[in-house]
Amino acid sequence: MEKSKRFWTEQRKREYIRSAEDNLFIIAGPGTGKTTLLSRRILNQIMGGERLSHFLLIAFTEEAVQEFKQKIKKHLYREIAINREASHRLKKKVHGIDLMHIMTFDDFCLWVLSVKKKETTEEKERNKIEKAEPGEEAEPGEESKTGEEAKKSEEVLSVEERCYRLLQEDKALLQVLRRDFSKIYADELQDLNQIQLNILLSLATDKKGKMRHNCLFMVGDPRQTIYQEAEEDKQVFFDMKKKMEEKKNVRVLYLNENYRANKILVDWINEAFRKRMHSYRDMYPSQRKEFLKHCPFHGVFRREFTGEDGIALRELVSEILFAYPDLKERDFLILCRSKEKQEYYKNSLSGVGFSDSALDKMVFEAHLSKGLNANIVIITEAGGNCSGKMENRLTRLEYVAVTRAKHVLIFLKGEAEEWFCDQYYGLHALQELRLGKKQ
């Protein structure tokens, strides 16, 4: 369905996403504002009379869950301020946001299983009372043994597998969930597995297997698949996309306009990954003139060093702060490959002037950086002599790392590099960061 809309402007697509009464499958690149779009669509549906209890929003992490709640509240408050006629009704909605079913997939599956467990327990209690003679207690006979065997059998299954099996076997429960959740949203679709997608489709389709009207909103980006190791798991997203393209009441749209990064970064990222990723789609910068004022310098740089990388990192950050004293901890994001290095770099920066709590928000393993961004992103341990196999495994993680930057991307290049192979990314050709000179 994207083909018929290929000449739509990015703005036209966004307007359509906010208000269209369609099932939507969105492929959204980094910095495209998907969280804001999703939140705005939910607000429009709330203003249209949809009850908060009818929404199910699946996020990949607990941090994303909280971010969605805050974004929806933010849009509600903004609407309250400008819409006097609806302000009284919307104020009541604000307090219900925290009670909405906005959760991770694991939490949702556990919730479904708990609903069934409660229902089963109540039914067993009723049966015991009905079967027992007056003055007698029901004996735990063969039925309890069967229950124990079933319990042991289920213990080897993941929570998603148990949930999906339950929905397949208990059609009455599935119908209740379909009735309760008329608006289903799924974020980070590229990192969901086949079982999780099957659960979504079970809820979003009717008894005949047809997609329910205006029920499902899915968003993801295959370039940011970092939690799927096996090739068949990475293929799940594309299989789902193909399936949705064949549905008459599903629209598939691409968003590639980057509102996060400046043109220098966007152009470099496109050039670096266009040949590295299958079916790569270029991003397009969308920045206002005042956007560049948010950071005192801009560009993609390298900083080479010899000796300890922790010392080199501390010296680099100290130089930047000395040159631009107005910068704060929120302007920095420092990314590395491992938990051990994360702690090492935090300790290395302890004398720079940032508090421990500030460093906890600045230094991350790269795979934990999704959803984060900063004016200045420093990539540590860059320039490694990666093998072909290592490169394939790391490419998507490297893409996630560099797309966190808004204005400045710095590769700290030393002697014990682990990723961003110089052979593939041409780091040696980048301008070396020398503060004090005009960049």
For each feature predicted by the language model, list its residue ranges.
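Conserved helicase NTPase motor core
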Residues: 1-27, 33, 101, 124-239, ...
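Helicase P-loop NTPase motor core
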Residues: 35, 146, 247-251, 258-356, ...
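P-loop NTPase Walker
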Residues: 1-115, 175, 403, 439
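Conserved two-lobed SF2 helicase motor
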Residues: 101-107, 359-367
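A short beta-strand element within the Helicase C-terminal
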Residues: 364, 368-385
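C-terminal accessory regions
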Residues: 381-438
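Conserved SAM-binding loop
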Residues: 57, 218, 334
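Conserved RecA-like helicase ATPase core segment
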Residues: 7, 197-302, 422-436
